[in-house]
Curated annotation (Swiss-Prot):
It catalyses: N-succinyl-L-glutamate 5-semialdehyde + NAD(+) + H2O = N-succinyl-L-glutamate + NADH + 2 H(+). Disulfide bonds: none annotated. The keyword Oxidoreductase applies. The gene is astD. This is N-succinylglutamate 5-semialdehyde dehydrogenase. GO terms for biological process: arginine catabolic process to glutamate; arginine catabolic process to succinate. SUPFAM superfamilies: ALDH-like (SSF53720). It comes from Shewanella woodyi (strain ATCC 51908 / MS32). Belongs to the aldehyde dehydrogenase family. AstD subfamily. Keywords: Arginine metabolism, NAD, Oxidoreductase. It comes from the Bacteria. Its EC number is 1.2.1.71. Catalyzes the NAD-dependent reduction of succinylglutamate semialdehyde into succinylglutamate. Gene3D superfamilies: Aldehyde Dehydrogenase, Chain A, domain 1, Aldehyde Dehydrogenase, Chain A, domain 2. NAD(+) binds at G220, S221, S222, R223, T224, G225.
C-alpha cells in the first residue's frame, strides 16, 4: 500500500517497480505504480477539499504544519537513515538534510508573512487591502538528490498558502516519500490535502497533463523541465515553477591560502558525489607556477577523498551515486571529454559492479576546442587554465545555464568585478558554491529555471495577490462626476 490518495493508503494498479540501495543493490522498497486513473482520483480528491483547506485559515493550516514539524523532529534519525539507504549519501550528510527539513518550517512561515501575507492602508479612494490567495491544486515533482528537503520546500509553502498537493516523487526515492506522507498523516493532515502518487514516466505524464491542476512545481533535469515548459506554453493560467541544473563555474584568482582554496573546491565539486545542482562543473585556474602548484595540491587531495557506503565507519566524504547507471554514465562522460582532447589529472573510476560507487575525477579540458555545455551530474570536475581575468569570466559565462557561480579571490575588487559580469542566480565569494541559505531565494537564469526562485521565494509562486479597495458602507462621493445627476 504505497499510494496515499484521499487519506487512504492503497496499492498501485500499474506495473511493479523497486528501489535499491545504490551502495549494495539491496532492494529496500517495492510496489506497483499509480495508473492514470489513480492519478485522476488523487487530483479529484485534492480539488474536493481545497476550498475547505483554504477556509481553515492560516492559523489552522499552520497548526497542522507545526505538528508535521514535531513529527520530523521525533523521526529525524529514521528520516536520515531512509534517505541514506535510498540515495547512498553518507549518514552525516543525510542527517543534515533531515535537519534542513525541520528548519524549512520556520523559514516558510517567515516567508509567507513577509512576502504573501495581508496588509492594508487608508487612501483617498478607500481602504486599500492586499491579500493573497492559493492557486488551488498544485503538483509537486521531487528529485532524487535531496528527496526529502527539496520537495518539502515546495509542499510546505504550498500548504501554508492554502493549496492542496499531489506529490509525485522521483521513482528512485519512493521510500523517502512514503515516510514523509506517513509523518504528515500522523500530524493530523485532513484527507485529500496531500496525495502521493508513486511511479515512473507514465505516472508523471498523467499528473503533469491533468486539466484540473492549477500549477506544477518541478525540481530536476533541464531536459525534463524544458519539456514541461513547452507543454505549459499555451496555458498562461497555470503557474509553473522550474528548478533545474547548471554547468556551474568556479574561478580561482590570487588566493594565498591554497589549502583553504582546495577545501572549498572539493566542497563545491564533490559533495554529494557531485549530485547537487549547484556543484562546480568547471574550474578556472590561472596559468603559471602558482596555478600549477594549486592544481597539484588539489589533485593530491582529490585522490585522498574517502568513498564508501552510506553506513561505512569511519564515515566517508563521498557516498554512492544514485545508481549504477548514473555511475557508468559518468565514466562515459569522462571518456568523451578525453576523446575531445582532455587530459586526466585524477581518473574517475567505477569502484564496484552493481553499485553507484565511483572515485572522484579531475580532468584538464583547456585544449578542448568546443567544450560541451553539459551538466555532468557527478564527481567529475573540468579544469580550464586562463591567462586573463576577463577571458576567464567570458568562458565562465559561456553556458546556456545560469544557476550558481563563484570566485575564490583575496581581492574584494576582483570579486565585485566578477559579480557585476557573471550571469547566475547564486554567486558566492570565498565560499563553496554548493552553500545556499534557506533564508534567501534559490534559483537561476537561462536553462536553470524560469524566473521562479524557490527557497525563501517559494511563497511567491504558491499564491497570487488580490488587491481590494473597501469601505464599510456604500456612500455618495462629496461631489459627482460631470454629467451625472443622482
Amino acid at each position: 500500500m504505497t499510494q496515499f490518495i484521499n487519506g487512504q493508503w492503497v496499492a498501485g494498479l500499474g506495473h511493479e517497480v523497486t528501489s535499491k540501495n545504490p551502495a549494495n543493490s539491496e532492494v529496500i522498497w517495492s510496489s506497483k505504480t499509480a495508473t492514470a486513473e489513480q492519478v485522476n482520483t488523487a487530483v479529484e480528491a485534492a480539488r474536493e477539499v481545497q476550498f475547505d483547506w483554504f477556509m481553515l485559515g492560516f492559523e489552522g493550516r499552520l497548526a497542522i504544519v507545526e505538528a508535521y514539524k514535531t513529527q520530523l523532529e521525533e523521526h529525524k534519525a529514521e528520516m536520515a537513515e531512509v534517505i541514506a539507504q535510498e540515495t547512498g549519501k553518507p549518514q552525516w550528510e543525510t542527517a543534515t538534510e533531515a535537519g534542513a527539513m525541520i528548519g524549512k518550517i520556520g523559514l516558510s512561515v517567515a516567508a509567507y508573512n513577509k512576502r504573501t501575507g495581508s496588509s492594508e492602508n487608508d487612501t483617498p479612494a478607500g481602504r486599500a487591502v492586499l491579500r493573497h490567495k492559493p492557486h488551488g491544486v498544485v503538483a509537486v515533482f521531487g528529485p532524487y538528490n535531496f528527496p526529502g528537503h527539496l520537495p518539502n520546500g515546495h509542499i510546505v509553502p504550498a500548504l501554508l498558502a492554502g493549496n492542496t498537493v499531489v506529490f509525485k516523487p522521483s521513482e528512485l526515492t519512493p521510500k523517502v516519500a512514503e515516510l514523509m506522507l506517513k509523518l504528515w498523516e500522523k500530524a493530523g493532515l485532513p484527507a485529500g490535502v496531500i496525495n502521493l502518487v508513486q511511479g515512473e514516466v507514465e505516472t508523471g505524464k498523467a499528473l503533469a497533463s491533468h486539466e484540473q491542476i492549477d500549477g506544477l512545481f518541478f525540481t530536476g533535469s533541464s531536459r525534463t523541465g524544458h519539456i514541461l515548459h513547452q507543454q505549459y506554453a499555451g496555458e498562461p493560467g497555470k503557474i509553473l515553477a522550474l528548478e533545474m541544473g547548471g554547468n556551474n563555474p568556479l574561478i580561482i584568482k590570487g588566493v594565498k591560502d591554497t589549502k583553504a582554496a582546495v577545501h572549498d573546491i572539493i566542497q563545491s565539486a564533490y559533495i554529494s558525489s557531485g549530485q547537487r545542482c549547484t556543484c562546480a562543473r568547471r574550474l578556472y585556474v590561472e596559468k603559471g607556477a602558482e596555478g600549477d602548484a594549486l592544481l597539484a595540491e588539489l589533485a593530491d587531495a582529490v585522490k585522498r577523498i574517502q568513498v564508501g557506503a552510506w553506513n561505512s565507519q569511519p564515515q566517508p566524504f563521498m557516498g554512492s551515486m544514485i545508481s549504477e547507471t548514473a555511475a557508468k554514465g559518468m565514466v562515459e562522460s569522462q571518456r568523451n571529454l578525453l576523446n575531445l582532447g582532455g587530459s586526466s589529472l585524477v581518473e574517475l573510476t567505477h569502484l564496484k559492479e552493481g553499485t553507484g560507487l565511483v572515485s572522484p575525477g579531475l580532468i584538464d579540458v583547456t585544449q578542448v576546442i568546443e567544450l560541451p555545455d553539459e551538466e555532468y551530474f557527478g564527481p567529475l570536475l573540468q579544469v580550464v587554465r586562463y591567462t586573463d581575468f576577463d577571458e576567464a569570466i567570458k568562458l565562465a559565462n559561456k553556458t546556456r545555464y545560469g544557476l550558481s557561480a563563484g570566485i575564490l579571490a583575496d581581492s574584494r575588487d576582483d570579486y565585485e568585478y566578477f559579480l557585476a559580469r557573471i550571469r547566475a542566480g547564486i554567486v558566492n565569494w570565498n565560499k563553496q558554491i554548493t552553500g545556499a541559505s534557506g533564508a534567501a531565494p534559490f534559483g537561476g537564469v537561462g536553462a536553470s529555471g524560469n524566473h521562479r526562485a524557490s527557497a525563501f521565494y517559494a511563497a511567491d509562486y504558491c499564491a497570487y495577490p488580490v488587491a481590494s479597495v473597501e469601505a464599510d458602507a456604500v456612500s455618495l462621493p462629496a461631489s459627482l462626476s460631470p454629467g451625472l445627476s443622482i
